[in-house]
Curated annotation (Swiss-Prot):
It is an enzyme of class 7 (translocase). One of its GO terms (molecular function) is ATP hydrolysis activity. Belongs to the ATPase alpha/beta chains family. One of its GO terms (cellular component) is proton-transporting ATP synthase complex. This is ATP synthase subunit beta. Produces ATP from ADP in the presence of a proton gradient across the membrane. The catalytic sites are hosted primarily by the beta subunits. F-type ATPases have 2 components, CF(1) - the catalytic core - and CF(0) - the membrane proton channel. CF(1) has five subunits: alpha(3), beta(3), gamma(1), delta(1), epsilon(1). CF(0) has three main subunits: a(1), b(2) and c(9-12). The alpha and beta chains form an alternating ring which encloses part of the gamma chain. CF(1) is attached to CF(0) by a central stalk formed by the gamma and epsilon chains, while a peripheral stalk is formed by the delta and b chains. It comes from Xanthomonas euvesicatoria pv. vesicatoria (strain 85-10) (Xanthomonas campestris pv. vesicatoria). The keyword Cell inner membrane applies. PROSITE patterns: ATPASE_ALPHA_BETA (PS00152). It catalyses: ATP + H2O + 4 H(+)(in) = ADP + phosphate + 5 H(+)(out). HAMAP family: ATP_synth_beta_bact. ATP binds at G148, G149, A150, G151, V152, G153, K154, T155. InterPro entries: AAA+_ATPase, ATP-synt_VA_C, ATP_synth_F1_bsu, ATPase_a/bsu_AS, ATPase_alpha/beta_chains, ATPase_F1/V1/A1_a/bsu_N, ATPase_F1/V1/A1_a/bsu_N_sf, ATPase_F1/V1/A1_a/bsu_nucl-bd.
């Protein structure tokens, strides 16, 4: 193994000089002697000097320290040994529970499966969240993005999806915490532990306080672990169905921006790295389903300043099958989950995939909400009395639909004090169809707020009338 010496340190960027005939390849991992720091080669500058990004704090590094080339990319433990463990970007355990007992190590830089190996499916994944199941259904083996600005509930929605899908899902899950709050990572660990599904989850964290190199690569570490479960065939010759949760994809882009600036690249639009589309593509193209197994990924995407046209969320949109857009306006009405049903989309929204009843109900709900949106200006200026009877009826139903989209979450029980509700797809379609048909025109709209199925809304209305 060739050895070089550190010649320059500028923040997270470290230059290392090697013999001219022993220059490491781009993405090779270098180990710095006497420290736990790993460097990843990013550029070859010529004259035997390579520019690297440090995966870890460079505090205490000094010039002339020896760096050894491992002659391979960063490799992380994969397989059953990773389940129930919390690891960092290099696959080192950070849960103080001993070493990770892994039979194999895989490099984090891998190519996406070839076209012939890929497989698509139209099987639906029920989430138990009414607004998602009705308006933007998820596909098994699909890619889902939760878009939202600061504080509208991306992480809470993701936790509820983990709660509803991962616990009911017999397969394995991988959670990659990319540049998010350490507290949320801690909450997630305890949530999994308390519900006895920890032995089916591998957790990889690169949190907000870590250097940009860690935050940039931690998504690839988590993805590599998920790929192993998908590709490793069991006795029947099949891989596994894996759930991959990434919170937050925007922080991955942001870390790429920091690294790009540190490496001296010219920034592009809004200061992002010039390689934004390529970096996103490299990650997203690997998150796919093959003939042996599937990866269903749910990714939270922070939207800077609530601007969906920002280059980072706009680049992410192109890769997803379903987009769930969280709206600050809906959150301000106290309707949670604050999903905007008119702005959320799904490729599964096709009568041949989801069935005619589901499709027709979703379309009617959308039309009713759209009509209400158009009438809001008239209502604000002239009031409800100036509307025709038909329009009044549409507005009344739309307001009931809006409130019926709200739902108490299991993961928010400690804050709301009301028990979480899981609503099956069949009950969801039945409830919204009945509201559109006018079967519940006689009930007050408040009865539809924060309930599960339509029967609960009727029960709540009866209680309200009894109190009155």
């Amino acid at each position: 193994m060739s050895q070089g010496k550190i010649v320059q340190i500028i923040g997270a960027v470290v230059d290392v000089e090697f013999q001219r005939n022993e220059v490491p390849k781009v993405y090779d991992a270098l180990k710095v002697e006497g420290t736990a720091i790993t460097l990843e080669v990013q550029q070859q500058l010529g004259d035997g000097v390579v520019r690297t990004i440090a995966l870890g704090s460079t505090d205490g590094l000094k010039r002339n320290l020896v760096a050894t080339n491992t002659e391979r990319a960063i490799s992380v433990p994969v397989g059953a040994g990773t389940l129930g463990r919390i690891m960092d970007v290099l696959g080192r355990p950070i849960d103080e529970a001993g070493d990770v007992q892994a039979s194999d190590h895989w490099e984090i830089h891998r190519s996406a499966p070839s076209y012939e190996d890929q497989a698509s499916t139209t099987e639906l994944l029920e989430t138990g969240i009414k607004v998602i199941d009705l308006m933007c259904p998820f596909a098994k083996g699909g890619k889902v993005g939760l878009f939202g600005g600061a504080g509208v509930g991306k992480t809470v929605n993701m936790m509820e999806l983990i709660n509803n899908i991962a616990k009911a899902h017999s397969g394995l899950s991988v959670f990659a915490g990319v540049g998010e709050r350490t507290r949320e990572g801690n909450d997630f660990y305890h949530e999994m532990k308390d519900s006895n599904v920890l032995d089916k989850v591998a957790m990889v964290y690169g949190q907000m306080n870590e250097p940009p190199g860690n935050r940039l690569r931690v998504a690839l570490t988590g993805l590599t672990m998920a790929e192993y479960f998908r590709d490793e065939k069991d006795a029947s010759g099949k891989g596994k169905d894996v759930l991959l949760f990434v919170d937050n994809i925007y922080r991955y882009t942001l870390a790429g921006t920091e690294v790009s600036a540190l490496l001296g690249r010219m920034p592009s639009a809004v200061g992002y790295q010039p390689t934004l589309a390529e970096e996103m593509g490299v990650l997203q193209e690997r998150i796919t389903s093959t003939k042996s197994g599937s990866i269903t990924s749910i990714q939270a995407v922070y939207v800077p300043a609530d601007d969906l046209t920002d280059p980072s969320p706009a680049t992410t949109f192109a890769h997803l099958d379903s987009t769930v857009t969280l709206s600050r306006n809906i959150a301000s009405l106290g309707i949670y989950p604050a999903v905007d049903p008119l702005d959320s989309t799904s490729r599964q929204m096709d009568p041949l995939v989801i069935g005619h009843e589901h499709y027709d109900t979703a379309q009617r709900v959308q039309q009713t909400l759209q009509k209400y949106k158009e009438l809001k200006d008239i209502i604000a200026i002239l009031g409800m009395d100036e509307l025709s009877e038909e329009d009044k009826q549409s507005v009344s139903r739309a307001r009931k639909i809006e409130r019926f989209f709200s739902q108490p979450f299991h993961v928010a029980e400690v804050f709301t004090g009301s028990p979480g509700k899981y609503v099956s797809l069949k009950d969801t379609i039945r409830g919204f169809k009945a509201i559109c048909d006018g079967e519940y025109d006689h009930l007050p709209e408040q009865a539809f707020y924060m309930v599960g199925s339509i029967e609960e809304a009727v029960e709540k209305a009866n209680k309200m009338s009894a109190k009155a």
